[in-house]
Amino acid sequence: MMMHQLRSRPTRFVALVALAAGALFLAAGGSEGACPPAGARYVVSGGSALVAVDPPPGQPKNDKGGSAMFGGTVARNMVNLTDKNIPGKFEPEDKEVLLWKADLGSKAYGGPTVAGGRIYVGTNNQRPRNDRDIHRTKDGMVEPLDKGVLMCFDEKTGKFLWQAVHDKLESGRVNDWPEEGVCATPTVEGDRVYYVSNRCTVMCLDANGFADGNQGFQGEKYKEKTDADVVWQYDMMKELNVFPHNMSAGCPLIVGDILFVHTANGVDDGHLNLPSPNAPSFIALDKKTGKLLWKNSLPGKNIMHGQWSNPTYAEIDGVKQVIFPGGDGWVYSFVPETGELIWKFDGNPKDSVYELGGTGTRSDYIGTPVIYDNKIYIGLGQDPEHSTGISHFFCIAPKKDKKGDISGVLEVKTKGADGKDVIGEKPNPNSCVVWHFGGEEARKFALRDFKFGRTMSTACIVDDILYISELAGQIHCMNAKTGEHYWKYDTKASIWGSAYFVDGKVYLATDSGDLFVFKHEKTPAKIDELEGITATELKEARKQIKARQKEVADKYLIAKIELDAPIRSTAHVTNGVLYVMTEKTLYAFKGKK
């Protein structure tokens, strides 16, 4: 396959060691019959009832008081329909626009989450807030100790309030990569802050810190006024034998009294062995106590690499369900109270193959499922170290009368002339696929041989218009109902975050430190860079393609704003303020009066 090279900075949160040559094919099930609750382990306690938290059938609603989780709501749609007068074209240091900025560590991926007058972000300790977290060398030099850190700031002023500081795992980079810090975006409900630490521990903190005394757990390592007050913690490595690959990065989902999270179970440093194939990938905890309610060991031995996606909740066609993307390329739906499997969906072609280093055609998920109009939207991707490659984006609509495998196709095996198995496909009568975008691009003069590349991003859907970005730098604008493709734009830098809609604009940040702002239209123009090309030679064709690309930029690009460092998070707006988190700085921007 022709590989489209990423134009990005070299650092990565899941940096890989040298890989052995060869390929590893991991196939997941694909029978036509209904699936039993494979891998389910029921540890259900009484009194843990779900309350109705149903996303609306169309437009999502946002909490004016503050977005409390990744994606804003349980639907995980990156859309804000409330705030207005959000700056779209500005200079970062313009005092009329810059409300405040706060120093972080040297890496920051988790957040920001804004709730209750506070802002929470995950980072590292490369710019320490406490002298105890440094090392003084014999010659008097000061070096920061490597730690994972969750920081809390005041929403209005950016004043530092407190932080949770986590030691690194003793096992090292295979489970806890150096200097990556806390990668999870926190979830906040009331005065409780939930996240997964770099130590693969689910944390519940008191949002007030120690200002209201020591709540819950009493054994905190640090208890100064700027330290975090731990209410409870659940160590997934100790309790469940989970083996996180390089980093734990789950953003918890809360529905009623239940907290859902990925465990990050994955392969070892050799990338061929799965140390804990029977450990759960998906769990549910009591949000008040941290008690395990249920666990599920899917995908089990079929995990290809790591697992860094997030769960989503929805009631679709009358069925309440929690939806987990798996590290085998399948999406799984479970009964929220028990963990019983409802359905599963394979996003890869049946003849796809996972290969070490990302040269294969089979992928898993880093982006989070989005619920819109009773449908699920998700794209496939891989560790960013694997670069880009052929991928797929799906819209699926599960039905209450369809259980088990709802993939678009089923696997068919035949014998080739050499006697070896040949993998093929046939239509799945139980399919719930509405539309699919991606696969091979065979049109003449195409700049690459696939339509859609691997993505780490979560979709943004508003007015039936969908925005989804790729790791390689492209953002696509499509019809959410039909999958019709309107236009795409190449930012020329890798994208780790997601598109975010607010105030008629779409914000998208890149690894080069740029914040792109696009104009949203309810009826976008269809500008296909390859359609209608009249050239017969490549040189002339490229000129025509560039003209189409310029047409997209002229019509939709509002601004390209340069910030101080790579941005590997999603822009966010709460209470009229635009928050942008680079690797080392949290910015708060306001609209001009």
Name each model-derived stretch.
Residues 1-10:
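N-terminal secretory signal peptides that target proteins for export/translocation
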Residues 10-11, 186:
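Structural motif marking the loop-to-transmembrane transition
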Residues 14-27:
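Bacterial N-terminal signal peptides
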Residues 30-593:
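Noncatalytic, solvent-exposed loop/strand surfaces
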